[in-house]
Amino acid sequence: MAKIVVALGGNALGKSPQEQLELVKNTAKSLVGLITKGHEIVISHGNGPQVGSINLGLNYAAEHDQGPAFPFAECGAMSQAYIGYQLQESLQNELHSMGIDKQVVTLVTQVEVDEGDPAFNSPSKPIGLFYTKEEANRIQQEKGYQFVEDAGRGYRRVVPSPQPISIIELESIKTLVENDTLVIAAGGGGIPVIREQHDSFKGIDAVIDKDKTSALLGADIHCDQLIILTAIDYVYINYHTDQQQALKTTNIDTLKTYIEEEQFAKGSMLPKIESAISFIENNPNGSVLITSLNQLDAALEGKIGTLITK
């Protein structure tokens, strides 16, 4: 039996609540399949599209005097509950259909970051909707947001993405796992908080990369494997070129060379690779599997996906 952290990509969960719910139902079948095979899993998820849409909608309401403005940390908390609820319900239903008596809990999770992290001066995490270049330029002029081109899919707003330092609710996660509870935690990388005087915490406007927090969580609870589910089947080098090549198996030294060659896009594949390296460096006997959400079953059989080891 292996202990596995499964990190679901926010972009892989669809573009609407309805699409997300259908994708989550299918994902629940694969995740419960891991449980029936004797594995112990903890689930994390991204929230890039969802938190951006929540923030956009609340800002629109505030600008039209239809409600108050909300800080980004609160938007992150809303996205954790919204995505977590759909995952939790789908998993509960699938477990029940399989005759498995197991509790599922979504834990709103805070993650400590450093207020002095240089990421606050260099926003890099894409969130929200995809725009054309013309639309992005117009919004940038109107609102002052920063945009980047995101892996050939369009332009997206970027926000600071500081490094996760510690998971505030870690002991609660451990206790739940030890008591045979299926835990959904660290959604969207966790709500970023900074430590103030007397060890109190305060939310800060940012989005932590969910794969980096998932790698930290995996190391903290001594997992055997980190599975990162995204929108593509493999990690590629020379992506979107005539020389595009899928990586089926690789190791962290090779990946470090590819990072030096700038093979991986910032804000999309690069943090996944950095997270894989971090997880394995903290757990040399562990492995990382990166593949698409709808190919999880095939990837677990070794038929598809990128497997990373030391």
UniProtKB/Swiss-Prot annotation:
Localization per Swiss-Prot or TrEMBL: Cytoplasm
Primary localisation category: cytoplasm
A Pfam family the protein falls into: AA_kinase
Domain of life the protein comes from: Bacteria
GO BP annotation list: arginine deiminase pathway
Cellular component, GO, one term: cytosol
Gene3D superfamilies: Acetylglutamate kinase-like (3.40.1160.10)
InterPro entries: AceGlu_kinase-like_sf, Asp/Glu/Uridylate_kinase, Carb_kinase
Catalytic activity: hydrogencarbonate + NH4(+) + ATP = carbamoyl phosphate + ADP + H2O + H(+)
GO molecular function: ATP binding; carbamate kinase activity
Keyword Nucleotide-binding tagged: yes
Keyword ATP-binding: yes
Enzyme Commission number(s): 2.7.2.2
Enzyme's top EC category: transferase
Record-stated family: Belongs to the carbamate kinase family.
Name this polypeptide is given: Carbamate kinase
Gene from which this protein is expressed: arcC
